[in-house]
């Protein structure tokens, strides 16, 4: 139906933009702020699921700034975005602080239809990706299911009146 068509069009638009998203200031800054909030929580997050939006920036900054991450699952609807992440972090990514190897898994899926098992990640991060989703409560419920008990879901999302001036222009 219409929802599937719109979802497909959004995916195509993301794939067109993914090649230029590496230097996007807004994505970099939003990611920095989300990870700054993550730093306020003094517990380890070894397995992190990154869904949609600033996937490239988030994975890159996790490798640069987190001392505890061991596994990152990069989930995006755009194959081009996932390939860009792989190009940037390489085949054998390591944490910047200690050179510890980090396993990265790549999953191509829509945010509201995650093919991730229940109770497998400590943290779910989504930076500016959930505003694309047709079923936001469903997507958040799917993300919650992937979390271990006492896991953390942390997201930055555009609100209804965000960037009004740009939409009008």
Model-derived features: where do they sit?
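Conserved class I S-adenosyl-L-methionine
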Residues: 152-169
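Class I SAM-dependent methyltransferase Rossmann-like catalytic core
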Residues: 1-46
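Class I SAM-dependent methyltransferase SAM/SAH-binding core
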Residues: 36-123, 137-141
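Glycine/Thr-rich phosphate-binding loops of Rossmann-like dinucleotide-binding domains
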Residues: 58, 134, 163
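A short glycine-rich, Lys/Arg-flanked "PGG" loop and its adjoining helix->strand segment in the class I
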Residues: 137-152
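Conserved catalytic-core motifs of eukaryotic protein kinase domains, centered on the activation segment
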Residues: 135-136, 159
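Short catalytic micro-motifs in class I SAM-dependent methyltransferases
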Residues: 128-131
